[in-house]
Amino acid sequence: MATLKQIQFKRSKTAGQRPAASVLAEGELAINLKDRVLFTKDDQGNIIDLGFAKGGSIDGNVIHKGNYNQTGDYTLNGTFTQTGNFNLTGIARVTRDIIAAGQIMTEGGELITKSSGTAHVRFHDSADRERGIIFSPANDGLTTQVVNIRVRDYKASSESTFAFNGNGLFSSPEVFGWKSVSTPVIYTNKVITNKKVKDDYDIYSMADNVPLSEITTAINHLRVMRNAVGSGIFHEVKDNDGITWYSGDGLDAYLWSFTWSGGIKSSHSISIGLTPGPKDYSILGPSSIALGDNDTGFKWHQDGYYFSVNNGTKTFLFSPSETTSLRKFVAGYSTNGTDLTTPPTENYALATVVTYHDNNAFGDGQTLLGYYQGGNYHHYFRGKGTTNINTHGGLLVTPGIIDVIGGSVNIDGRNNASTAMFKGNTTGSSSVDNMTISVWGNTFTNPSEGNRKNVMEISDATSWMSYIQRLTTGEVEMNVNGSFESSGVTAGNRGVHTTGEISSGAVNALRIWNADYGVIFRRSEGSLHIIPTAYGEGKNGDIGPLRPFSIALDTGKVVIPDLESSYNTFAANGYIKFAGHGAGAGGYDIQYSQAAPIFQEIDDAAVSKYYPIVKQKFLNGKAVWSLGTEINSGTFVLHHLKEDGSQGHTSRFNADGTVNFPDNVQVGGGEATIARNGNIFSDIWKTFTSAGETTNIRDAIATRVSKEGDTMTGKLTLSAGNDALVLTAGEGASSHIRSDVGGTNNWYIGKGSGDNGLGFYSYITQGGVYITNNGEIALSPQGQGTFNFNRDRLHINGTQWTAHQGGGWENQWNQEAPIFIDFGNVGNDSYYPIIKGKSGITNEGYISGVDFGMRRITNTWAQGIIRVGNQENGSDPQAIYEFHHNGVLYVPNMVKAGARLSAGGGDPVWQGACVVIGDNDTGLVHGGDGRINMVANGMHIASWSSAYHLHEGLWDTTGALWTEQGRAIISFGHLVQQSDAYSTFVRDVYVRSDIRVKKDLVKFENASEKLSKINGYTYMQKRGLDEEGNQKWEPNAGLIAQEVQAILPELVEGDPDGERLLRLNYNGVIGLNTAAINEHTAEIAELKSEIEELKKIVKSLLK
């Protein structure tokens, strides 16, 4: 039962104020006096409005005066009658037809017809017949819409439909333009422009493109066409230059164009006058013009160059600088263009070269080839320059002559002889052989000896005939290779020289003259005289009275009535006297080039001749002595020979300074004699005999040094080969040479005992070298047998070294060794081998060597080197192993151990294949075929193997790296999965998130808003390549790193613009999700609270 409190009204005079749920009990009333509204609280705790203002039912008529304002829908079941205007500011919706007796007008400017099917606007006549219709078919979605206009023609019992497409196309059965039709595009079968008036154009396409430039908007597209589906498409457009044609789906390939100035341009080729038919085009390729047939015309080559082509053959190359003929070039005259049978008109040149610019003043100054005049062809080369014929074959003029008028013929042989040749022939008055006139010199080809400055030589096929030359000294000479005939010869200062004879039949055949005297060589009967002229008649005078020199031509006797010279006298009593300074006087060093009072010069290639220079014959004794030279050896000899050929002997003075005498040589009056057997006899040896007779040197030497033994106080020098000193001893006796110094034994060489050993021994140092009885060699330094050699080996007795040297490591830096090589100071980049061996395989080669040595490089300690490789050349393989002072061993290729390898770990605990590192139970151990185990301090940590591994549903592989049970992989760097073909599979992932490693904590703000900018996707993701190398894809789901990077870039790693793929920290996204969930949780809690309160109000109101 309601209490008094519950039926009281809570009041409010504030417009729009509603009571709070907390101030009303369920069913309690409140009133807003300003709004005239009652409120209560339902059993749900919601505040609800009461009264008609909030709804209700009215049964009966309602008469209302005043304005009626309603917010919401109005539903009328019945007839709506209106006597005044109907003003509607919203939308009037009717479900039936609207029939108006008058007009339906819209002042807003729009009339909309809407339908899920075809929308219509119809036009009917009074008989309700369709005149026309505007309709738009249903094309739902993102499609091109169409509006059609259909017009009836009842007279022709037909209709026409005009279609307007949303893509701008207009289609009509027929279009008639009374004046013109303007449209960007027309699709039709034909355009008829009959009955047009004067000055009308069939097509008027005046585009208003702005700006006027070579861009897309400045192109007027005129026509596009093709002949069938799939065929080539052609486009005709108007651009700034003119009309242009293209092919392709768009303006892809330029074809050809007409320019506004009248030019025509083609992108490929032009064919003119080819055989009939549409398919015959130029086959000369791009940038060509075909004339008449498809492979004759012009073909562009490069910038400024083009070819003329005839039947596919390039014949001329035209360029800015020249025209090149690529085939035989023929210049001729023709009246019909096909043959050259008609000569040209008079004074007509087949080719004219304009050469008058140098003002050469020859004719019209032009060069004319094939100039026809008087029935003959002439060729004129004009100009002030030079006509050059630079051919190895030269210039051939056949037949004809070469006239040089007002100039000269210059022949420049350059570094060869300049030659003019006169060809021989076998007819007429021609010479038989070729004859040449050559001009040359040898001062350049042989500067050290050449003295022929200028030579002009006449030759035929046999040899040279004559030449005239100037020497480097200035003289001029003329030589004839044969006889020389002349009616008279006048010789200048150089005279006449010949290797043949000078022949003259005149009595006075030769005259030598000067202004005062002349000398005439005169043949008179049986004699030849040399006769001087009278004084003053040297050139033309006759012979004088003197006869100073005559030769009897029958006997050869020379008659010189009076012979006198400055230093020589030929006396009538038979002697020749050389007075004054004889020829050849001077030092020995100049004698080869000097003469002598009696001088003979021998020039003979024979090798077995004797040339005497002085000879004396003793007639009574019938013997002859001569002095001369044997030219085979150059030996000067003194020779004796009897008339009967006996007693022929020769004493020789040889070029090497030795002298050979044929028998004993006696000195003085015979007191000393050198015998043929080498013995010397002399009376100086008498003092060494008891009888006083002459003794020879052999006996004297034997007397001086006793054969039985003696002491020499002087030096003994043996200059002899072979066994110059022979020691002879009995069987088993010693045989040696010993040296005593100061009366004490010092050394000996020889056999010192009963065996056949040979020694070299020092008594003082007790060191020696001994060749044993079996041929071994022993070296005993300081009395100790340390080294022993035989044919197989070198043995070193190391006990001597250990007896005198320490074996501790600490002193090795300054100790020598049994084999010790001190190279001294060497270069800073050098290698010196200490021991080297070499061998080759029989019949195979592969000469190889192994050596151990020392290498030095700049500013560091030495390296020990073992070199193994070829000994044939520097290119075949060789391996160099380096041992460094810091313990580093460098191996160029591979270290191969039989089973175990230790790197500072001592003896491995494992007996099989292993590598220990640091200690003997840490390293890599072979775990079977294709498997390696990693072990640390005996604990098996991990393995890798080529064996097959399978994880059902995830992956399988034939090779893997794994840890053993309970072991872990710990990384102090990144763990990176490089390839996009594979993934990382784990049971759980624990990411370090301790607050102790974090600072500057800031909670997310507006997390939901940030999260709303990130989308989740399903997608196909790259998964490596398949067996054929194609990209594989697999379905996946997740986020896009770029989207996350846009709001939280700190969660993304990688270069978005480079090739590095972006990596996303999904844990950071979890933090964002958590913050967004927290925001949603708070909002949901607040909404739940408000809902509960509203439920209570509604519940109270409904009671």
UniProtKB/Swiss-Prot annotation:
Instruction: Give a single Pfam family match.
Output: Peptidase_S74
Carries keyword Transcription? no
Annotated segments matching region Interaction with the receptor-recognizing protein gp38 = 988-991
Q: What is its main location?
A: virion
Tell me how the protein is altered or processed after translation.
Answer: Proteolytic cleavage and release of the chaperone in the host cytosol stabilizes the folded protein.
| Domain Peptidase S74 residue range list | 993-1091
Lipoprotein among keywords: no
Site residues, Cleavage: 993-994
Listed A to Z, the keywords are:
Host-virus interaction, Viral attachment to host cell, Viral tail fiber protein, Viral tail protein, Virion, Virus entry into host cell
Tell me where in or outside the cell this protein is found.
Virion
Family matches, as InterPro entries: Gp34_trimer, S74_ICA
GO biological processes: symbiont entry into host cell; virion attachment to host cell
Q: Subunit arrangement?
A: Homotrimer. Interacts with the receptor-recognizing protein Gp38.
In Swiss-Prot or TrEMBL terms, this protein is called Long tail fiber protein Gp37
Q: What is the native source organism of this protein?
A: Escherichia phage AR1
Q: Which gene encodes it?
A: 37
